[in-house]
């Protein structure tokens, strides 16, 4: 009996494919059942984060046919939405990102839907902004964020510039499943779409409005012009170079050294296998350059410039990486103190963080009289809180949102994390502390002295292959069927299961949070984009060593469960 995946493979092999890279790849795997099964037994699933997969031939890979199919599904949904019948598109520096962006534009144009596409790579915040600026029905960002070079992806956005809602994504997925991957999508060439006036480039007016929206969120305007901040910046061969340097120069930062090997777009990411500003390897070249130049600060943005990581210069001249939680707390503290001082703090201010981000932020928010809301993981839930404030005519109350995974936003002009404003505010904050004879390191130590030494660490456990998802499901179910009563000798005093919305007041999510008798917390959840289970630890100690020792005890106790 010939399996269905074998038949699908044969169909692709015999088709007249319009991508020269795919045919040799298909011929090469002839007779290799395991490889054919991996590529054709399943299709990439379209969810609220869109698509993400390895580049290559097959239904379980990212290629022009999977992009056409996904875009036809999106187009079918857009046609039911009325409005402008317009979709905004942007893309990052990844391999084939520009090709996939133009492919999506061709499908939309063939469906009589207008397209606004950037004429060169631009980051996530630029896509979110254009979606709102042109009052689009949807937006598409071609990116796989900080995954290795062999990946690409396709993020879909709703009309508010927020990643697509579960309901809309479910309808799009249904439409995708009705569309034959090779022949089902309507299509015209990009050139034809431009000629017919269906495809237009994003105008300079939109780009300028984005920069103005970001720069209007400075806490102490003009400060950077005289503070003399010395900066090293790396776009990690991604889309951050133009927007980040433009905004930093606009606010008065002149001394910017770009890491030369990581300056220009390069989808092969030859300097680091994982272009992720959360990890040391991605920041290593920048750190070396910071040491050489004596920079006050080193910044790195990921390929789609929605996350930013930093290293700060300490008073003793050494450099220290700063976690996403620490940067989030530093920014919250800086924005609150600065806006109170300048008289620009709104009445009843609101900040938002994800449930896995540090509780230290709660203590800081309380100190400044700010309402801090905790939402599910995924920046769209922070965007959703902004939308709720907007609907009530109170959008000015929103001052800041962050996730521990290096995502920040300090205004309602976009609805996704924005490494451009993150970079601007981090630089302004560093410049301010420099101008008063302090530093980021000193301020962070003062915060710990005031509120306690919190340590936040994440461990990831990988579950590769087709069976990986099943193992992850079984593991999470096991934690529910046989609940833990203690971890490393600490009694569990409260378990919050986010699959029970009636208990949390939030939409259902596959997340378990354990609160221990000493005030520490452990969060267990599967990753939304990778075959991993993540465990987040928040421990508290008199000093860093004590907090780290606590974390190690908890991690050792949980390791056997993840085996």
Name these PLM-found stretches.
Residues 88-151, 249-309:
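N-terminal small/polar loop signature for handling phosphorylated ligands or for N-terminal nucleophile
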Residues 35-40, 44, 152-285, 289-290:
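Gly/Ser/Thr-enriched, mixed-charge loops and adjacent short helices
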Residues 40-60, 144-145, 231, 235-247, ...:
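Conserved phosphate/anionic-ligand binding catalytic regions in large, soluble enzymes, centered on
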Residues 291, 295-297, 318, 338-525, ...:
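Phosphate-binding and adjacent anionic-ligand microenvironments
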Residues 4-104, 111, 194, 199-227, ...:
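An N-terminal, well-structured beta->alpha segment
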Residues 98-103, 128-132, 150-156, 177, ...:
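Short acidic, glycine/serine/threonine-rich loops at helix termini
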């Amino acid at each position: 009996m010939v399996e269905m995946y074998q038949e699908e493979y044969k169909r692709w092999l015999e088709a007249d494919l319009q991508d020269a890279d795919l045919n040799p790849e298909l011929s090469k795997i002839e007779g290799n059942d395991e490889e054919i099964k991996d590529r054709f037994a399943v299709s990439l699933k379209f969810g609220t984060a869109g698509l993400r997969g390895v580049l290559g031939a097959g239904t379980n890979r990212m290629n022009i046919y999977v992009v056409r199919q996904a875009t036809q599904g999106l187009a079918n949904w857009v046609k039911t939405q009325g409005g402008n019948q317009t979709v905004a598109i942007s893309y990052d520096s990844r391999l084939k990102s520009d090709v996939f962006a133009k492919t999506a534009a061709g499908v939309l144009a063939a469906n009589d839907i207008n397209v606004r596409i950037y004429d060169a790579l631009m980051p996530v915040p630029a896509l979110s902004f254009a979606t709102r600026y042109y009052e689009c029905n949807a937006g598409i960002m071609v990116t796989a964020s900080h995954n290795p070079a062999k990946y690409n992806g396709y993020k879909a956005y709703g009309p508010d510039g927020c990643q697509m809602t579960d309901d809309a994504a479910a309808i799009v997925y249904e439409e995708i499943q009705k569309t034959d991957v090779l022949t089902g999508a309507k299509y015209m060439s990009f050139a034809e779409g431009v000629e017919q006036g269906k495809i237009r480039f994003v105008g300079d007016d939109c780009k300028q409005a984005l920069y103005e929206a970001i720069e209007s969120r400075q806490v102490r305007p003009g400060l950077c012009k005289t503070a003399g901040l010395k900066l090293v910046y790396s776009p990690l061969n991604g889309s951050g170079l133009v927007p980040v340097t433009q905004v930093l120069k606009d606010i008065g930062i002149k001394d910017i050294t770009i890491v030369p090997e990581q300056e220009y777009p390069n989808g092969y990411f030859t300097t680091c296998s994982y272009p992720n500003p959360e990890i040391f390897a991605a920041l290593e070249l920048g750190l070396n350059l910071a040491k050489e130049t004596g920079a006050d600060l080193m910044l790195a943005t990921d390929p789609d410039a929605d996350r930013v990581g930093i290293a700060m210069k300490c008073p003793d001249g050494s450099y220290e990486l700063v976690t996403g939680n620490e940067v989030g707390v530093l920014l919250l503290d800086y924005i609150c103190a600065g806006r109170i001082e300048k008289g620009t703090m709104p009445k009843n201010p609101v900040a938002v963080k994800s449930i896995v981000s540090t509780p230290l932020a709660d203590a800081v928010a309380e100190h400044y009289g700010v309402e801090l809301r905790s939402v599910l993981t995924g920046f769209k839930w922070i965007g959703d809180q902004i939308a709720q404030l907007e609907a009530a005519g109170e959008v000015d109350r929103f001052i800041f949102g962050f996730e521990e995974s290096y995502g920040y936003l300090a205004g309602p002009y976009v609805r996704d994390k924005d490494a451009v404003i993150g970079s601007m505010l981090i630089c302004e904050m560093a410049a301010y502390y420099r101008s008063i004879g302090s530093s980021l390191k000193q301020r962070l130590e003062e915060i710990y002295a005031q509120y306690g030494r919190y340590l936040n660490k994440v461990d990831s456990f990988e579950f590769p292959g087709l069976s990986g998802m099943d193992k992850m499901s079984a593991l999470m179910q096991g934690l529910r069927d046989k609940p833990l009563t203690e971890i490393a000798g600490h009694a569990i005093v409260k378990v919050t299961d986010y699959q029970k919305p009636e208990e949390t007041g939030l939409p259902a999510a596959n997340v378990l949070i354990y609160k221990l008798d000493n005030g520490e917390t452990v969060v267990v959840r599967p990753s939304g984009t990778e075959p991993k289970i993540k465990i987040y630890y928040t421990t508290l100690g008199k000093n860093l060593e004590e907090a780290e020792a606590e974390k190690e005890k908890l991690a050792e106790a949980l390791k056997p469960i993840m085996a």
